[in-house]
């Protein structure tokens, strides 16, 4: 199936990548076939999130997507964390977004 192409390629190269502790796959922000392949091949996900007004909308979308992929295609997929980007501690909005993200995952 098309969703497993990256997982199959990484499995075929397991001798080459066995010496690495982590393999990072940088994906586009949309849920296309490339991102779906990465989620199927991955053990975990780190989500970069800009500290902006609609940030939590993106968080809820990605958590639903990860849950759906875990149920249907990759049972070992886990959300390992959110990495806040464009964070400006002088900006009240950045602090509010950080606080909201922490509350979302409690």
Predicted regions and their residues:
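Conserved catalytic-core segment of NTP-binding enzymes
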Residues: 11-106
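Short glycine-rich substrate-engagement loop in P-loop NTPases that contacts/grips substrate
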Residues: 1-6
């Amino acid at each position: 199936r098309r969703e497993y192409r990256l997982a199959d390629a990484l499995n075929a190269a397991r001798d080459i990548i066995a010496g690495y502790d982590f393999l990072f796959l940088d994906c586009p922000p949309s849920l296309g076939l490339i991102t779906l392949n990465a989620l199927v091949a991955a053990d975990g996900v780190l989500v970069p999130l800009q500290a902006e007004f609609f940030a939590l909308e993106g968080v809820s979308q990605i958590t639903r997507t990860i849950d759906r992929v875990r149920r249907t295609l990759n049972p070992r997929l886990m959300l390992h964390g959110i990495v806040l980007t464009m964070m400006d501690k002088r900006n009240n909005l950045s602090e509010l977004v950080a606080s909201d993200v922490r509350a979302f995952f409690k």
